[in-house]
UniProtKB/Swiss-Prot annotation:
This is Homoserine kinase. Keywords: Amino-acid biosynthesis, ATP-binding, Cytoplasm, Kinase, Nucleotide-binding, Threonine biosynthesis, Transferase. Pathway: Amino-acid biosynthesis; L-threonine biosynthesis; L-threonine from L-aspartate: step 4/5. ATP binds at P97, I98, G99, S100, G101, L102, G103, S104, S105, A106, C107.
Length: 318
């Protein structure tokens, strides 16, 4: 018996909701923009193999891989429930560039924990599993946060609430939106991107941030796509992180001139997203970004839609 789980890319923050909003996305051409993890019965307690486009970026020692840490915390939780742990052999297919702003670590974490849970007949519920995912994300970035793991696991646009035992809740979004995702092929570490942020903010920025986020959520629920797009502005991180992203300002300017509704930084970058309502506009923006924002052959551009499913079992073989 074996199981394979695919976990999609995600946009942390979605510009307007620093650390509290996240959206899962998938290319419209069917490309799997995300990681896959296979779990099968093993001869030892834990073994790990790696594969995929970005396998050379992973640590050589399996015990330095986040998938091993996922297995450790999953084992811990099963032990608490007195559920027997099976010997597992796992394969991580690493298709997501590391430090890309596409929720790369979240993809590996979500795929690994979801696959382990599926393989053991789902002893952990969604909230328990999501809590572990946040714990693992915190191990990498230095603080527990859910804005990538929640949409990656649950799908859609997720708002982190973290009250009453609820970690996140889905916010209705707009099916007609195309999300053009452009990764230039360079790395920006989440830790570095956090270090350049100020420790205190001016009152007017706090007010603007509250207005933008409240306005965006209201527009999503009241089905006002133009207003929602107008509210996607970042006063918390983008003004400080722009300098880490070569050509970001030019890309945003071009996208606006081509008809995109808004452009922002995905997570801590360097990936950007542009939202368009017209497929021709999305294709035009995509072509420009491919020629002017992508810097090497590791970079890519995809026209995406919101991925409403999140992580999913794709079969029993990679």
């Amino acid at each position: 018996m074996s199981v394979v789980v695919y976990a999609p890319a995600s946009i942390g923050n979605v510009s307007v909701g620093f650390d509290v909003l996240g959206a899962a996305v998938s290319p419209i051409d069917g490309t799997l923009l995300g990681d896959r993890v296979l779990v099968e019965l093993g001869s030892e307690a834990f073994t790990l193999a790696t594969a995929g486009s970005f396998v050379d970026k992973l640590p050589e020692n399996p015990k330095d891989n986040i998938v091993y840490d996922c297995w450790c915390v999953f084992s811990r939780e099963l032990n608490k429930k007195n559920v027997a742990l099976k010997n597992v052999h796992m394969i991580l297919e690493k298709n997501m560039p590391i430090g890309s702003g596409l929720g790369s670590s979240a993809c590996s974490i979500v795929a690994a924990l979801d696959a382990l849970n599926q393989f053991h007949d789902n002893p952990l519920n969604d909230v328990e599993l999501l809590a572990l995912m946040g714990e693992m994300e915190g191990q990498i970035s230095g603080g527990i946060h859910y804005d990538n793991v929640a949409p990656c696991y649950l799908g859609g646009l997720q708002l982190m609430v973290e009250e009453l035992g609820i970690i996140s809740q889905e916010v209705p979004c707009f099916d007609e939106w195309y999300w053009v995702m452009a990764y230039p092929g360079i790395k920006v570490s989440t830790a570095e991107a956090r270090e350049i942020l100020p420790s205190q903010y001016r009152r007017q920025d706090v007010i603007a941030h509250g207005r933008n986020l409240a306005g965006f959520i209201h527009a999503c629920y009241s089905k006002q796509p133009e207003l929602a797009a107008k509210m996607i502005k970042d006063v918390v991180a983008e003004p400080y992180r722009e300098r880490l992203l070569p050509n970001f300002a030019k890309a945003r300017e071009y996208a606006a001139s081509a008809g995109a509704l808004t452009t922002g930084i995905s997570g801590s970058g360097p990936t950007l997203f542009s939202i368009c309502t017209d497929k021709d506009v999305a294709d035009r923006v995509s072509r420009w970004l491919q020629e002017n924002y992508v810097q090497n052959n590791e970079g890519f551009v995809h026209v995406c839609r919101l991925d409403k499913q999140g992580s999913q079992v794709t079969g029993s073989k990679l």
